[in-house]
Amino acid sequence: MSKEPIIKLDNIDVTFHQKKREINAVKDVTIHINQGDIYGIVGYSGAGKSTLVRVINLLQEPSAGKITIDDQVIYDNKVTLTSTQLREQRREIGMIFQHFNLMSQLTAEQNVAFALKHSGLSKEAKAAKVAKLLELVGLSDRAQNYPSQLSGGQKQRVAIARALANDPKILISDESTSALDPKTTKQILALLQDLNKKLGLTIVLITHEMQIVKDIANRVAVMQNGKLIEEGSVLDIFSHPRESLTQDFIKIATGIDEAMLKIEQQEVVKNLPVGSKLVQLKYAGHSTDEPLLNQIYKEFEVTANILYGNIEILDGIPVGEMVVILSGDEEKLRQACQAITDSQVQLTLLKEGGKA
Protein backbone atom coordinates (compact mmCIF):
# COMPACT_ATOMS: atom_id res chain seq x y z
CA MET A 1 0.00 0.00 0.00
CA SER A 2 1.38 3.40 -0.99
CA LYS A 3 2.33 5.75 1.81
CA GLU A 4 1.53 8.84 -0.28
CA PRO A 5 -1.50 10.83 0.89
CA ILE A 6 -4.21 11.18 -1.75
CA ILE A 7 -6.30 13.41 0.55
CA LYS A 8 -4.76 16.14 2.70
CA LEU A 9 -7.03 18.26 4.85
CA ASP A 10 -4.97 20.83 6.74
CA ASN A 11 -6.30 23.06 9.53
CA ILE A 12 -9.88 22.85 8.27
CA ASP A 13 -12.50 25.09 9.86
CA VAL A 14 -16.18 25.10 8.91
CA THR A 15 -18.35 27.79 10.46
CA PHE A 16 -22.08 28.31 9.91
CA HIS A 17 -23.98 31.49 10.73
CA GLN A 18 -27.57 31.02 11.86
CA LYS A 19 -29.76 33.78 13.30
CA LYS A 20 -26.86 35.79 14.69
CA ARG A 21 -25.30 32.59 16.06
CA GLU A 22 -21.96 31.21 14.95
CA ILE A 23 -21.72 27.43 14.82
CA ASN A 24 -18.23 25.94 14.57
CA ALA A 25 -19.03 22.60 12.93
CA VAL A 26 -15.39 21.69 12.26
CA LYS A 27 -12.53 23.16 14.27
CA ASP A 28 -8.93 23.14 13.02
CA VAL A 29 -8.93 19.53 11.79
CA THR A 30 -5.92 18.06 9.99
CA ILE A 31 -6.23 14.61 8.40
CA HIS A 32 -4.04 12.95 5.75
CA ILE A 33 -5.43 9.84 4.04
CA ASN A 34 -3.12 7.58 2.06
CA GLN A 35 -3.84 6.11 -1.36
CA GLY A 36 -5.57 2.75 -0.90
CA ASP A 37 -6.62 3.34 2.71
CA ILE A 38 -9.99 2.41 4.10
CA TYR A 39 -10.16 5.32 6.51
CA GLY A 40 -12.89 5.43 9.13
CA ILE A 41 -14.12 8.67 10.68
CA VAL A 42 -16.15 7.93 13.80
CA GLY A 43 -18.30 10.16 15.96
CA TYR A 44 -21.79 10.62 17.28
CA SER A 45 -24.37 12.86 15.59
CA GLY A 46 -23.19 16.46 15.57
CA ALA A 47 -19.51 15.53 15.79
CA GLY A 48 -18.81 17.22 12.43
CA LYS A 49 -17.72 14.11 10.54
CA SER A 50 -20.16 14.44 7.61
CA THR A 51 -19.44 18.16 7.31
CA LEU A 52 -15.72 17.39 7.24
CA VAL A 53 -15.91 14.85 4.41
CA ARG A 54 -18.10 17.16 2.33
CA VAL A 55 -15.14 19.53 2.09
CA ILE A 56 -13.14 16.83 0.28
CA ASN A 57 -15.06 17.56 -2.94
CA LEU A 58 -16.06 21.09 -1.86
CA LEU A 59 -19.73 20.26 -1.53
CA GLN A 60 -19.09 22.18 1.68
CA GLU A 61 -16.65 25.06 1.37
CA PRO A 62 -14.50 25.47 4.49
CA SER A 63 -14.14 28.76 6.33
CA ALA A 64 -10.39 28.26 6.50
CA GLY A 65 -7.71 25.68 5.75
CA LYS A 66 -6.11 23.89 2.84
CA ILE A 67 -7.35 20.92 0.79
CA THR A 68 -5.07 18.88 -1.45
CA ILE A 69 -6.47 16.01 -3.52
CA ASP A 70 -4.03 13.77 -5.38
CA ASP A 71 -1.30 16.45 -5.18
CA GLN A 72 -3.60 19.20 -6.51
CA VAL A 73 -4.45 22.06 -4.16
CA ILE A 74 -8.17 22.71 -4.61
CA TYR A 75 -8.62 25.06 -1.68
CA ASP A 76 -6.22 27.33 0.16
CA ASN A 77 -8.39 29.69 2.19
CA LYS A 78 -10.33 30.05 -1.07
CA VAL A 79 -11.28 27.77 -3.97
CA THR A 80 -8.31 27.52 -6.35
CA LEU A 81 -10.15 25.83 -9.24
CA THR A 82 -12.39 27.17 -11.97
CA SER A 83 -15.95 25.81 -12.07
CA THR A 84 -14.95 23.51 -14.96
CA GLN A 85 -11.89 22.22 -13.08
CA LEU A 86 -14.01 21.66 -9.98
CA ARG A 87 -16.52 19.57 -11.95
CA GLU A 88 -13.65 17.46 -13.29
CA GLN A 89 -12.20 17.09 -9.80
CA ARG A 90 -15.53 15.91 -8.41
CA ARG A 91 -15.63 13.12 -10.99
CA GLU A 92 -12.61 11.67 -9.16
CA ILE A 93 -14.67 11.32 -5.98
CA GLY A 94 -17.72 9.05 -5.67
CA MET A 95 -20.20 9.24 -2.80
CA ILE A 96 -22.74 6.87 -1.27
CA PHE A 97 -25.18 7.70 1.51
CA GLN A 98 -27.51 6.17 4.10
CA HIS A 99 -30.46 6.91 1.81
CA PHE A 100 -29.67 5.48 -1.58
CA ASN A 101 -30.91 8.47 -3.62
CA LEU A 102 -31.95 6.31 -6.56
CA MET A 103 -34.47 7.61 -9.08
CA SER A 104 -37.59 5.54 -8.60
CA GLN A 105 -38.73 5.82 -12.23
CA LEU A 106 -35.44 4.39 -13.55
CA THR A 107 -34.26 0.77 -13.52
CA ALA A 108 -31.04 -0.24 -11.76
CA GLU A 109 -29.29 -0.15 -15.14
CA GLN A 110 -30.67 3.30 -15.95
CA ASN A 111 -29.74 4.67 -12.52
CA VAL A 112 -26.11 3.68 -13.08
CA ALA A 113 -26.16 4.96 -16.68
CA PHE A 114 -27.42 8.35 -15.49
CA ALA A 115 -24.02 9.01 -13.91
CA LEU A 116 -22.45 8.63 -17.38
CA LYS A 117 -24.66 11.30 -18.96
CA HIS A 118 -21.76 13.70 -19.55
CA SER A 119 -19.04 11.07 -19.99
CA GLY A 120 -18.72 11.45 -23.76
CA LEU A 121 -19.00 7.69 -24.20
CA SER A 122 -20.97 6.17 -27.06
CA LYS A 123 -24.28 4.45 -26.33
CA GLU A 124 -22.62 1.05 -26.76
CA ALA A 125 -19.68 1.96 -24.51
CA LYS A 126 -22.06 3.22 -21.81
CA ALA A 127 -24.10 0.01 -21.95
CA ALA A 128 -20.94 -2.09 -21.67
CA LYS A 129 -19.67 -0.05 -18.73
CA VAL A 130 -23.00 -0.23 -16.89
CA ALA A 131 -23.09 -4.00 -17.37
CA LYS A 132 -19.54 -4.27 -16.02
CA LEU A 133 -20.36 -2.12 -12.98
CA LEU A 134 -23.48 -4.11 -12.12
CA GLU A 135 -21.44 -7.30 -12.40
CA LEU A 136 -18.81 -5.79 -10.12
CA VAL A 137 -21.38 -5.19 -7.38
CA GLY A 138 -23.12 -8.54 -7.93
CA LEU A 139 -26.33 -7.25 -9.51
CA SER A 140 -26.17 -8.37 -13.15
CA ASP A 141 -29.45 -10.25 -12.73
CA ARG A 142 -31.22 -7.16 -11.38
CA ALA A 143 -30.37 -4.71 -14.18
CA GLN A 144 -34.00 -4.30 -15.30
CA ASN A 145 -35.48 -4.01 -11.80
CA TYR A 146 -36.79 -0.73 -10.43
CA PRO A 147 -35.75 0.43 -6.93
CA SER A 148 -39.15 -0.61 -5.52
CA GLN A 149 -38.33 -4.18 -6.58
CA LEU A 150 -34.98 -4.21 -4.78
CA SER A 151 -34.01 -4.86 -1.16
CA GLY A 152 -32.11 -2.25 0.85
CA GLY A 153 -28.82 -4.01 0.24
CA GLN A 154 -29.48 -4.25 -3.49
CA LYS A 155 -30.35 -0.55 -3.65
CA GLN A 156 -27.06 0.28 -1.96
CA ARG A 157 -25.22 -1.91 -4.48
CA VAL A 158 -26.83 0.10 -7.31
CA ALA A 159 -25.75 3.30 -5.54
CA ILE A 160 -22.19 1.97 -5.28
CA ALA A 161 -22.14 1.04 -8.98
CA ARG A 162 -23.39 4.53 -9.85
CA ALA A 163 -20.74 6.13 -7.61
CA LEU A 164 -18.04 4.16 -9.47
CA ALA A 165 -19.32 5.04 -12.95
CA ASN A 166 -16.71 7.74 -13.62
CA ASP A 167 -13.79 5.65 -12.31
CA PRO A 168 -13.16 7.68 -9.16
CA LYS A 169 -9.99 7.26 -7.13
CA ILE A 170 -11.87 8.04 -3.91
CA LEU A 171 -15.19 6.74 -2.56
CA ILE A 172 -16.86 8.53 0.35
CA SER A 173 -19.30 6.37 2.30
CA ASP A 174 -21.46 8.54 4.58
CA GLU A 175 -23.33 6.21 6.98
CA SER A 176 -24.04 3.98 3.97
CA THR A 177 -25.00 0.94 6.07
CA SER A 178 -27.04 2.74 8.77
CA ALA A 179 -30.39 1.77 7.23
CA LEU A 180 -29.41 -1.87 6.68
CA ASP A 181 -29.83 -4.97 8.85
CA PRO A 182 -26.67 -6.55 10.36
CA LYS A 183 -26.38 -9.32 7.76
CA THR A 184 -26.75 -6.92 4.82
CA THR A 185 -24.35 -4.48 6.48
CA LYS A 186 -21.67 -7.18 6.57
CA GLN A 187 -22.28 -7.95 2.89
CA ILE A 188 -21.96 -4.29 1.87
CA LEU A 189 -18.80 -3.87 3.96
CA ALA A 190 -17.34 -7.00 2.34
CA LEU A 191 -18.14 -5.49 -1.07
CA LEU A 192 -16.41 -2.22 -0.17
CA GLN A 193 -13.38 -4.14 1.04
CA ASP A 194 -13.33 -6.12 -2.21
CA LEU A 195 -13.55 -2.93 -4.30
CA ASN A 196 -10.72 -1.42 -2.28
CA LYS A 197 -8.50 -4.38 -3.19
CA LYS A 198 -9.61 -4.84 -6.81
CA LEU A 199 -9.63 -1.18 -7.84
CA GLY A 200 -7.08 0.30 -5.43
CA LEU A 201 -9.95 2.52 -4.31
CA THR A 202 -9.39 4.87 -1.38
CA ILE A 203 -12.47 4.71 0.85
CA VAL A 204 -13.43 7.29 3.45
CA LEU A 205 -15.98 5.73 5.78
CA ILE A 206 -18.21 7.94 7.95
CA THR A 207 -19.98 6.10 10.76
CA HIS A 208 -21.12 6.27 14.37
CA GLU A 209 -20.31 2.58 14.85
CA MET A 210 -16.78 1.49 15.75
CA GLN A 211 -17.80 -2.08 14.86
CA ILE A 212 -17.89 -1.07 11.17
CA VAL A 213 -14.44 0.51 11.39
CA LYS A 214 -13.15 -2.60 13.16
CA ASP A 215 -14.46 -4.83 10.39
CA ILE A 216 -12.83 -3.19 7.36
CA ALA A 217 -10.78 -0.03 8.04
CA ASN A 218 -7.02 0.21 8.46
CA ARG A 219 -6.98 3.73 9.95
CA VAL A 220 -9.47 5.64 12.07
CA ALA A 221 -10.12 9.18 13.26
CA VAL A 222 -12.44 9.97 16.17
CA MET A 223 -14.33 13.28 16.20
CA GLN A 224 -16.20 15.03 18.98
CA ASN A 225 -17.84 18.48 18.89
CA GLY A 226 -16.14 19.39 15.62
CA LYS A 227 -12.66 18.44 16.81
CA LEU A 228 -10.37 15.55 15.94
CA ILE A 229 -9.64 13.95 19.31
CA GLU A 230 -7.75 10.80 18.28
CA GLU A 231 -6.28 9.33 15.09
CA GLY A 232 -4.14 6.35 14.13
CA SER A 233 -4.10 2.81 12.81
CA VAL A 234 -7.09 0.68 13.80
CA LEU A 235 -4.69 -1.67 15.60
CA ASP A 236 -3.17 1.15 17.68
CA ILE A 237 -6.50 2.78 18.48
CA PHE A 238 -8.09 -0.51 19.57
CA SER A 239 -5.01 -1.58 21.53
CA HIS A 240 -4.28 1.75 23.23
CA PRO A 241 -7.24 4.17 23.10
CA ARG A 242 -6.38 7.40 24.91
CA GLU A 243 -9.61 9.38 24.93
CA SER A 244 -12.63 8.35 27.00
CA LEU A 245 -14.97 8.65 23.99
CA THR A 246 -12.75 6.31 21.98
CA GLN A 247 -12.68 3.87 24.88
CA ASP A 248 -16.49 3.95 25.02
CA PHE A 249 -16.76 3.26 21.27
CA ILE A 250 -14.38 0.32 21.58
CA LYS A 251 -16.19 -1.17 24.58
CA ILE A 252 -19.41 -1.18 22.57
CA ALA A 253 -17.66 -2.69 19.53
CA THR A 254 -15.97 -5.50 21.48
CA GLY A 255 -18.84 -6.23 23.86
CA ILE A 256 -16.51 -6.18 26.88
CA ASP A 257 -18.88 -4.05 29.00
CA GLU A 258 -21.71 -6.55 28.59
CA ALA A 259 -19.31 -9.40 29.37
CA MET A 260 -18.06 -7.63 32.51
CA LEU A 261 -21.60 -7.24 33.86
CA LYS A 262 -22.02 -11.02 33.65
CA ILE A 263 -18.57 -11.70 35.09
CA GLU A 264 -19.20 -9.47 38.11
CA GLN A 265 -22.30 -11.53 38.97
CA GLN A 266 -20.37 -14.79 39.22
CA GLU A 267 -19.91 -16.11 42.77
CA VAL A 268 -16.21 -16.76 42.20
CA VAL A 269 -15.75 -13.04 41.46
CA LYS A 270 -18.07 -11.76 44.19
CA ASN A 271 -16.18 -13.84 46.77
CA LEU A 272 -12.70 -13.59 45.28
CA PRO A 273 -10.36 -15.20 47.85
CA VAL A 274 -7.12 -13.81 49.23
CA GLY A 275 -4.25 -14.79 46.94
CA SER A 276 -6.30 -14.16 43.78
CA LYS A 277 -6.50 -11.27 41.35
CA LEU A 278 -9.15 -10.55 38.73
CA VAL A 279 -7.28 -9.05 35.77
CA GLN A 280 -7.98 -7.97 32.23
CA LEU A 281 -5.35 -8.84 29.62
CA LYS A 282 -5.02 -7.17 26.21
CA TYR A 283 -2.55 -8.36 23.65
CA ALA A 284 -1.76 -7.93 19.96
CA GLY A 285 0.32 -9.45 17.19
CA HIS A 286 2.94 -11.99 18.20
CA SER A 287 1.89 -11.98 21.84
CA THR A 288 -1.36 -13.74 20.90
CA ASP A 289 0.70 -16.74 19.79
CA GLU A 290 2.47 -17.19 23.13
CA PRO A 291 1.04 -19.79 25.57
CA LEU A 292 1.46 -17.19 28.31
CA LEU A 293 -0.88 -18.56 30.95
CA ASN A 294 0.71 -21.99 30.60
CA GLN A 295 4.14 -20.41 31.07
CA ILE A 296 3.25 -18.54 34.25
CA TYR A 297 1.86 -21.74 35.74
CA LYS A 298 5.08 -23.63 34.99
CA GLU A 299 7.36 -20.82 36.14
CA PHE A 300 5.46 -19.31 39.06
CA GLU A 301 2.83 -21.95 39.96
CA VAL A 302 0.16 -19.32 39.35
CA THR A 303 -3.09 -20.73 37.99
CA ALA A 304 -5.41 -18.91 35.58
CA ASN A 305 -9.18 -19.29 35.47
CA ILE A 306 -10.36 -17.77 32.17
CA LEU A 307 -13.75 -16.07 32.53
CA TYR A 308 -13.85 -14.29 29.17
CA GLY A 309 -11.83 -14.39 25.96
CA ASN A 310 -12.10 -12.75 22.56
CA ILE A 311 -9.80 -12.48 19.53
CA GLU A 312 -10.36 -10.07 16.63
CA ILE A 313 -8.40 -9.68 13.41
CA LEU A 314 -7.68 -5.96 12.92
CA ASP A 315 -6.06 -5.02 9.61
CA GLY A 316 -4.71 -8.57 9.37
CA ILE A 317 -3.28 -8.65 12.91
CA PRO A 318 -4.80 -10.72 15.75
CA VAL A 319 -5.81 -8.70 18.81
CA GLY A 320 -7.06 -10.45 21.92
CA GLU A 321 -8.66 -9.67 25.25
CA MET A 322 -9.18 -11.90 28.28
CA VAL A 323 -10.55 -11.57 31.79
CA VAL A 324 -8.94 -14.11 34.13
CA ILE A 325 -8.54 -14.92 37.80
CA LEU A 326 -4.88 -15.42 38.69
CA SER A 327 -4.27 -17.37 41.91
CA GLY A 328 -1.08 -18.22 43.80
CA ASP A 329 1.45 -17.21 46.44
CA GLU A 330 1.51 -13.40 46.89
CA GLU A 331 5.13 -12.93 45.77
CA LYS A 332 4.78 -15.44 42.93
CA LEU A 333 1.61 -13.67 41.87
CA ARG A 334 3.44 -10.33 41.75
CA GLN A 335 6.23 -11.90 39.67
CA ALA A 336 3.72 -13.52 37.32
CA CYS A 337 1.96 -10.18 36.72
CA GLN A 338 5.32 -8.58 35.98
CA ALA A 339 6.18 -11.39 33.55
CA ILE A 340 2.86 -10.86 31.76
CA THR A 341 3.55 -7.13 31.43
CA ASP A 342 7.11 -7.86 30.22
CA SER A 343 5.58 -9.99 27.45
CA GLN A 344 3.98 -6.83 25.98
CA VAL A 345 0.59 -7.78 27.31
CA GLN A 346 -1.42 -4.96 28.86
CA LEU A 347 -2.58 -6.00 32.33
CA THR A 348 -5.30 -4.14 34.25
CA LEU A 349 -6.13 -5.13 37.82
CA LEU A 350 -9.92 -5.26 38.19
CA LYS A 351 -10.22 -6.72 41.69
CA GLU A 352 -7.96 -8.06 44.42
CA GLY A 353 -8.96 -11.07 46.49
CA GLY A 354 -10.18 -10.38 50.01
CA LYS A 355 -11.11 -6.78 49.16
CA ALA A 356 -14.53 -5.32 48.36
Swiss-Prot record:
Q: Record keywords: ATP-binding included?
A: yes
- What InterPro entries does this protein map onto? AAA+_ATPase, ABC_transporter-like_ATP-bd, ABC_transporter-like_CS, ACT-like_dom_sf, MetN_ABC, MetN_ABC_transporter-like, NIL_domain, P-loop_NTPase
| Membrane topology type | Peripheral membrane protein
Question: SMART domains of this UniProt entry?
Answer: AAA, NIL
Any single GO CC term annotated in Swiss-Prot or TrEMBL for this entry: plasma membrane
Citing just one GO molecular function, the answer is: ATP hydrolysis activity
**Protein's job:** Part of the ABC transporter complex MetNIQ involved in methionine import. Responsible for energy coupling to the transport system.
Give the family, as the similarity comment puts it: Belongs to the ABC transporter superfamily. Methionine importer (TC 3.A.1.24) family.
Name of the featured protein: Methionine import ATP-binding protein MetN
Q: Which organism is it from?
A: Streptococcus agalactiae serotype V (strain ATCC BAA-611 / 2603 V/R)
Which lineage?
Bacteria, Bacillati, Bacillota, Bacilli, Lactobacillales
